[in-house]
Swiss-Prot record:
Pfam families referenced in this protein's UniProt entry, alphabetically: EF-hand_7
Protein name, entry field: Parvalbumin beta 2
Family: Belongs to the parvalbumin family.
GO (cellular component) term, any one: sarcoplasm
Keyword vocabulary terms for this entry: Acetylation, Allergen, Calcium, Metal-binding, Muscle protein, Repeat
Binding site residues for Ca(2+) 1: D50, D52, S54, F56, E58, E61
Binding site for Ca(2+) 2: D89, D91, D93, M95, E100
Role of this protein: In muscle, parvalbumin is thought to be involved in relaxation after contraction. It binds two calcium ions.
Native organism: Oncorhynchus mykiss (Rainbow trout)
Domain EF-hand: 37-72, 89-107
GO molecular function terms attached to this record: calcium ion binding
């Protein structure tokens, strides 16, 4: 399982946002019980999402967010990617730091 999450919870969360422009980060994290994950698990999850190991999640990495949970999941639309980035980008630098990602999950 990804970051210690329950596979059935993750499958339900992915199914709920299968349609384009239906992704809502709060609903996804709630369905997957990600908010119950420890801060260490959240940092590990963010580090796994950080494909280029920059310490940040850039828009191209956020776009592929769902595929980290299931290879067959769709990419996020540009609108979904921008909405998730803006929701978590506390310092306005256009990227999510790993700490910002952990805060976003807990919202």
């Amino acid at each position: 399982s990804f970051a210690g999450l329950n596979d059935a919870d993750v499958a339900a969360a992915l199914a709920a946002c299968a349609a384009a422009d239906s992704f809502n980060h709060k609903a996804f994290f709630a369905k997957x019980x990600x908010x119950x994950x420890s801060p260490d698990d959240l940092k590990k999850x963010x580090x796994x999402l950080d494909q280029d190991k920059s310490g940040f999640l850039e828009e191209d990495e956020l776009k592929l967010f769902l595929q980290n949970f299931s290879a067959s999941a769709r990419a996020l639309t540009d609108a979904e990617t921008k909405x998730x980035x803006x929701a978590g980008d506390a310092d306005g630098d256009g990227m999510l730091g790993l700490d910002e990602f952990a805060v976003l999950v807990k919202q």
